[in-house]
C-alpha cells in the first residue's frame, strides 16, 4: 500500500482546508483579501484589497541615457494598469544636448511627467529627497531610469503591502536582461556590509525554501524600485545625504526598522533592470575612496546590527555566497 504522503497532489483536501483557514483569518481580522493556491502544494498567495486610488509619485533621477529613460517611461505608460500616478524625472548634470531635446519631447508625449532640475553635484540621497519634497503623492515610488516594467499590476502588488499599517516599504523582483535575478531582497552582512540574495540565480527558480517566489520581510530592498508611504518617508527623514552613492537604500530601510516598520519583498512586481553585471566596480581612486568612506560610515552607524547578523537570514547560511548555501565552519 502506497502512502499518500509521498504524493503532495493526493492531499488536495488539506490544501483547500489551509486556504479556508487563511480566508477565515482575514475575515476575523477585518481584512479584505483573496487567497489562492500556488503551484507549490501548501503555499498560498494572498491579495489584499487596495483602499481607494491614492496618488503614487514615481521619482526617477536621470543623467543623459535618454534611451534607457524612454524605455522606462514607455513601459510605465503602456503596461501599468494602475493609473493614478505622476512621474517626476529629476535631471541632474546631463552633458549631452540631445538629452534636453528629449526632455521637451518627453513632457509633450507623457502628460503625467514633470521635469525637475537638480543643480548640485550627484548625490542619490539628496536628489530623491529633493524630488520627494515636490511630489504630490501619498506614496513615493523610487525608480531607476534603467528599468522596464514587466508585470502590469506591479504598482498594485507593492501598494497592497504598503497600505498595511506596519509596512514601511515594499520592493520588487528585478531581472537582468538574460532573465537571471538582479534583486530579490537584501541581506545584511552578505558579502561584507549587505548584498542582494540570489543574485544571478535563474529567474525561473523558486529559491531556497521558496524565497524567490514568496512575499516576505527582509531587512532591506533596493531603491531601484521601492514604494514607500510618504508619512513613513518623513518619519525617518528620508534618505541620509551622507550616503552619496552606496548604502543609502539599505540605511533607509534600517531606519524604518528602528521605527518597527516592516520592509517587504514581493515577487509579483517584476521589472527588468538593465544594469550591467559588472556595473558598480570601484575602478578609480576617487570611487574607491568614496566607497570606503561610505562603508566606514555605515559600519559606524549600524555596527551593532552588523554584529548581530540579519534577523531575516539564518546564521547557519553563508554570508560569502548569495545562494543560501550552508556556512562553512
Task: List each model region and its residues.
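Short, acidic, metal-binding catalytic loop of nucleotide-sugar glycosyltransferases
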Residues: 74-84
